[in-house]
Amino acid sequence: MNIIIMIIIAYLLGSIQTGLWIGKYFYQVNLRQHGSGNTGTTNTFRILGVKAGIVTLTIDILKGTLATLIPIILGITTVSPFFIGFFAIIGHTFPIFAQFKGGKAVATSAGVLLGFAPSFFLYLLVIFLLTLYLFSMISLSSITVAVVGILSVLIFPLVGFILTDYDWIFTTVVILMALTIIIRHQDNIKRIRKRQENLVPFGLNLSKQKNK
C-alpha cells in the first residue's frame, strides 16, 4: 500500500504543469497556442521570457527530485527511490491536470537523476552543455544526452566509471527515460534534419540551422 501511495504522489507531482500554469495565471498566455505548443521549459523561455523560464526549469527539476526522495523521506527501503521518481516523469508527460498532454520530460528526468545519482546527473549535464554550445539547440542537446545516457548505463559499470556496478532498476529506468525523451522529440528531429530547428542565441550552430 505504501508503494502505491508513493507512486500516486510522484505522479501527481509530475503532473504539475509549471509553464502552462505560469503562462495562464501570470501572463494570460496559453503556451499551447504559441511557439512549439509545448508546455515545458524551452517554450516557456521562448514565449514568456527568462524569469518565467527559470522558474519553470527550477520547479520541473525539483518535482522530479522530490518524487525520487519520497521513499527516503518516509524511511521506506523496500522500493528503489529511482523507481518512484520515474512516475513523476510519467506524470509530467501525461499529466492528469492538463488532459494528459504534457511536456518532453527533460527537466523532470534531470531532477530524478539529481535525486538518485547526482554524479551521473553532473556527467550528463556536462554533455548537455557542451552539445548546446556546439550546436545551439536545446532539442539536439536533450536527444544527445538521452542517447549518451543509454550507452553510459550499459558501458560504465563494465569499466567502473561513475557507475560501479549494474543496478537493473537504474539501468531499466534510465533507458525508459531516455526513450521517452527521444520519442517526445520526433518533431524536433524532423526540423533538425531540414535545418529548420529553433536555436538559442549563443553557441556555434555547427549544423547551420536556419532557425525558421
Curated annotation (Swiss-Prot):
Entry keyword annotation includes Transferase: yes
A biological process from GO: phospholipid biosynthetic process
Keyword Transcription: no
Pfam families: G3P_acyltransf
Enzyme nomenclature, EC number: 2.3.1.275
Transmembrane segments: 3-23, 70-90, 110-130, 143-163, 164-184
Domain of life: Bacteria
Record pathway: Lipid metabolism; phospholipid metabolism
Keywords: Cell membrane, Lipid biosynthesis, Lipid metabolism, Membrane, Phospholipid biosynthesis, Phospholipid metabolism, Transferase, Transmembrane, Transmembrane helix
Catalytic activity: an acyl phosphate + sn-glycerol 3-phosphate = a 1-acyl-sn-glycero-3-phosphate + phosphate
Subcellular location: Cell membrane
Entry GO terms, CC: plasma membrane
Subunit structure: Probably interacts with PlsX.
Main function: Catalyzes the transfer of an acyl group from acyl-phosphate (acyl-PO(4)) to glycerol-3-phosphate (G3P) to form lysophosphatidic acid (LPA). This enzyme utilizes acyl-phosphate as fatty acyl donor, but not acyl-CoA or acyl-ACP.
Alphabetical list of PANTHER family matching this protein: GLYCEROL-3-PHOSPHATE ACYLTRANSFERASE-RELATED (PTHR30309:SF0), INNER MEMBRANE PROTEIN YGIH (PTHR30309)
Family (UniProt): Belongs to the PlsY family.
Protein name, UniProt field: Glycerol-3-phosphate acyltransferase
Protein's organism: Streptococcus agalactiae serotype V (strain ATCC BAA-611 / 2603 V/R)
Gene from which the chain derives: plsY
